[in-house]
Amino acid sequence: MENNKLKLSIKTLQSIFSNTNEPEWFLNTRKLALYKSYTLPFPKLESMELERWNLFNVDFSTLRLENKGNVEIAEYGINSDDFAVVQKNNTIVHINIPEKYADKVVIKDIFSAMNDNHIKDSFMSVVDYAESKVTAVHYTLLNAGLFIDVKDNVVIEEPLQYIVISDKEQSIFNHVTIQVGKNAKFNFIENYVNNQREDKAPFSLVSEVVAHEGAQINYSSITNQPGEKRGTILRRGLTYRDSLINWNVAAMDEADVYHDNTTNILGDGSEANLKIVTLGVKEQKTYFNSEVVNQGLSSKGDILQHGVLLDRSHIVFNGVGFIVKGATGSNAYQSSRMLTLSSEAKADANPMLLIDENDVMAGHGASLGRIDEEQLYYLQSRGLTRKESSRLLVHGFLSPVISELTVDKIKELVTILIDEKINNNERE
């Protein structure tokens, strides 16, 4: 399909990104990725076709927008002395690192970081441009992002807040790379804010997390893209010996989104946990490919994902637990549950275990069901409306995942977004 090819010359590509101050090696990567994008396939999905999503209908003139006026960070719940990064459109407009952390962590916009050699240890190490058409286009048009390097033996309990604001119609190809040093501990919260209800520009978000020996990172994410948009979100992790990555994902979008959440549990004794909560509305299509790949001895990988469907939405949970040959003593578990509040909604769950080793523990479970009319009737008999009753049951259904989110601010925001979506979309 012609709409799935970037109509972009090398000359135009160079012109678009002439003001990023990026090194020549990355410009060459853009060119290679552009060539690859013409021949690489889309990821193969069950029940959905990315080829039909028109993901690459990009207005190239909006890839590098100028921000006008000051950004009032207080509007987004950020104080000037908070440990925080604020990005507006494609530009980081605020970075504050408290003095006590100044020599413990490096935080830079992605293009500034490219000019430091140590970024090459982690940037593009987990997500390769030649992986698929989606990744090739992402690296071709990468226009914003953040690089974080937490030094060895550093423990930072206070979470870094990363607020990404879009107040204009723009395609954002955002890239976050986080490298956590040996025996370090780090907490990260990202919140994508877009109140442009008529924004139709496609988006591509990629996060790479590398946890070195003994490191721990809690990565919490809220996305809330508007309903006219379509896009892809890739979150990838790599764990070395005795390290831990906790992914806490609240996908509150109204946009059609393909999510790929994959962690390679490489080191012996390392662990990855993925928790996802989502709510589908209107005609929304959402696909989650969630994978944990146990490669190290006595490694552990868990997937827990809960979804609620309203209206005519369609959600797919594709879960894969893969224990490779030689990963003895490993443990892989996954649970996918979906609750439908509409007879027109469609829910699919595809749990898979791929086990190439004997001395392991593995399990999976999936459940799809309609909201319980008897429970609704009971609550309504106590004076609640049907909508209020539905909201209580939805919160109860999602609470096992929301309660596992490690940051109170994330829990509160997710709860508010769930209530808004039920009030705006659920039929009486």
Feature locations, PLM:
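Short acidic alpha-helix initiation/capping motifs at coil-to-helix transition points
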Residues: 12, 367-373, 391-393
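N-terminal amphipathic, basic helical "cap/leader" segment at the start of enzyme domains
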Residues: 1-139, 144, 310
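Short amphipathic alpha-helical segments at helix boundaries and their inter-helical linkers
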Residues: 44-49, 62, 391, 396-413
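Conserved beta-strand/loop scaffold segments within soluble protein domains that form the structured core
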Residues: 103, 114-384, 398-428
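Small-residue helix-packing motif on alpha-helices
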Residues: 37, 270, 389-390
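Short amphipathic alpha-helical segments with coiled-coil-like heptad repeat character
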Residues: 41-49, 156-157, 300, 387
